[in-house]
């Protein structure tokens, strides 16, 4: 397990810019969990969802920053590496606007 400092406002109000979050490597992510990901050369803290076709959705919790959402199609060949689950008091709801 480890801690990481979050930069940016895309995860507010659940995770504030500059705050430190704790990450569990042992917990597998399920839809709606928040994780730390390495995608296309960038580290990201995002909410995770995967559909039945294997497409991965990485959401910003701050819906004013939905421009930072990512969709990684299963057929894209892009590797999404998850370093672990961010430990939050409760699981945030998945966005309704995707």
Where do the language-model regions lie?
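Acidic/glycine-rich C-terminal interaction modules and beta/coil loop segments
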Residues: 1-98
